């Protein structure tokens, strides 16, 4: 958020944070509060959306939640909006190995796209070449 605030200051655009509560983890309300407080600190508009709790604990739970999350993003994004996601290098590695274990072919092993169209806007993942530990280290310095 700190880097986006710097960009906003120099480029004059609206910055909005979107928090999705999946209602899966026991600390999900605490995470929402943390995100909301952080956005207040940075003076960033905060939108939160709570997904309906899924009763069946199928192996597809993660996919179902992802699909619901992206449908919300598609509805929420305005024309020419950019949605920045926090996916990082560790996610790329995890996705590759999970796909390989499932027996995906060459196309199924392709990397997470750095950007793609989403609804009326665009989804961008600026941290795909940075590890989670490096992101956390940078955040602690801020």
Predicted regions and their residues:
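Core alpha/beta nucleotide-donor-binding catalytic domains of modification enzymes
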Residues: 1-142
């Amino acid at each position: 958020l700190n880097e986006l605030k710097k960009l906003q200051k120099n480029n004059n655009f609206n910055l909005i944070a979107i928090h999705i509560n999946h209602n899966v983890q026991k600390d999900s309300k605490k995470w929402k509060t943390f995100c909301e407080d952080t956005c207040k600190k940075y003076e960033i508009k905060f939108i939160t959306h709570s997904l309906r709790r899924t009763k069946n604990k199928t192996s597809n739970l993660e996919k179902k939640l992802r699909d619901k999350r992206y449908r919300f993003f598609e509805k929420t994004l305005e024309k020419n909006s950019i949605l920045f996601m926090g996916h990082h290098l560790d996610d790329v590695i995890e996705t590759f190995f999970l796909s390989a274990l499932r027996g995906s072919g060459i196309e199924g092993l392709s990397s997470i796209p750095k950007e793609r169209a989403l609804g009326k806007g665009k989804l961008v993942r600026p941290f795909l070449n940075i590890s989670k530990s490096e992101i956390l280290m940078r955040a602690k310095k801020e």
